[in-house]
């Protein structure tokens, strides 16, 4: 019976590998197994095939509802947002990454593109969404869902949260407010600074 491989304690040769694409039928079978593992653990909201030793571009997410990702690709992403993430493959480790509050993806099993948004007021005509008032809790869940989808798609491309932490050195700097906390990487040292203090270091 397959289980999540803890990369802090044992080697997982697939964790940094771009996974092979699979058919929809094979992907659905793998997704069923991933949901079983996720439901048994009860401490995660998403899981990718390589986290349990399967070389297949398949992942599942379960935040607001179960989502299956077979050979997914991010078509568009916008509105960067800093976020602290953990990972079942690196249990107990948490890093700040930069994700996007809005993404559009395409999967193998769906003809239409999927739009995920954690933004309070989605706008600018990208994708489609329901125009209704959202509670703060619902906004938080939608953002978490969008970030989890990005996290799992990263896994399918051999990218982990450790890789994303190193990339959080200010991208699209005009999106950050003066007092927003960002992460600066200088050689091997990574530290948090307010954007107004970090900006001179990256200009």
In which residue ranges do the predicted regions lie?
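Positively charged
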Residues: 1-181, 185-192, 196-202
């Amino acid at each position: 019976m397959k289980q999540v491989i803890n990369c802090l304690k044992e080697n997982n040769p697939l964790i940094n590998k771009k996974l092979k694409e699979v058919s929809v039928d094979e992907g659905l079978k793998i997704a069923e197994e991933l949901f079983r593992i996720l439901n048994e653990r009860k401490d995660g909201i998403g899981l990718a095939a390589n986290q349990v030793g399967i070389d297949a571009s398949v992942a599942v997410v379960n935040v607001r509802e179960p989502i299956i990702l077979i050979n997914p690709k991010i078509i568009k992403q916008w509105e960067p947002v800093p976020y602290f993430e953990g990972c079942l493959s690196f249990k107990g480790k948490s890093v700040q990454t930069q994700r996007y509050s809005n993404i559009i993806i395409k999967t193998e099993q769906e003809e239409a593109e999927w739009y995920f948004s954690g933004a309070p007021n989605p706008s600018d005509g990208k994708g489609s969404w329901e125009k209704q008032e959202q509670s703060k809790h619902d906004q938080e869940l939608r953002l978490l869902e969008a970030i989890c989808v990005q996290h799992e798609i990263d896994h399918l491309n051999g990218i982990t949260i450790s890789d994303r932490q190193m990339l959080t050195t200010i991208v699209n700097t005009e999106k950050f407010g003066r007092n927003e906390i960002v992460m600066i990487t200088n050689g091997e040292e990574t530290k948090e600074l307010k954007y107004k203090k970090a900006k001179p270091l990256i200009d």
